[in-house]
Amino acid sequence: MMASILLTLFRRTKKKYRRHTDDQVFNNPASKIKQKPGKIFCSAPVENLNKLRGECLRMMEMLKEETWRIYPVLLPQMELLERECRTPVTGQKVQMTYNWTQWLQTLYTMIMEENVPDMDLLQALREGGVITHQEQTMGMYVLYLMQRCCPMLPKLQFLKKIGKLI
């Protein structure tokens, strides 16, 4: 429910924003790459690599703009979550490094520094003992909200995962 409210607020604040939905590969089924079974198609001319690099830079700039636009909408929501979602007392005192607002600020800063945050990063921090399980859950929720509000973030996360992010 909160994600839908945030998306509504985000859509009201954005102006002159257009998502690119025209995908030539899916619109033109005749253009298929001839490939031998068991072979991976990975050879690309230099001009294609330059085009890919330019496309990655363009996508990163769009992500920065999307994040800059959604940050003022998400910040009050994170502050509200901080006040309303107190951790239950379990008998153990767990020192938390991050709260909701700090997660938002951390992920925002990472994106502005052109580092693409993803779930694998949060899992690695958890396994390394840097953050607790609860902090990881909070970070994943904030990242999920950012993915829902910033359409470019999942695309760049995918490029990062397959090793094509330049």
From Swiss-Prot:
<dbReference type="Pfam" id="PF16821">
    <property type="entry name" value="C_Hendra"/>
</dbReference>
<keyword id="KW-0922">Interferon antiviral system evasion</keyword>
<dbReference type="InterPro" id="IPR031812">
    <property type="entry name" value="C_Hendra"/>
</dbReference>
<keyword id="KW-1090">Inhibition of host innate immune response by virus</keyword>
<protein>
    <recommendedName>
        <fullName>Protein C</fullName>
    </recommendedName>
</protein>
<keyword id="KW-0899">Viral immunoevasion</keyword>
<comment type="function">
    <text>May counteract the cellular interferon antiviral system.</text>
</comment>
<keyword id="KW-0945">Host-virus interaction</keyword>
<dbReference type="GO" id="GO:0052170">
    <property type="term" value="P:symbiont-mediated suppression of host innate immune response"/>
</dbReference>
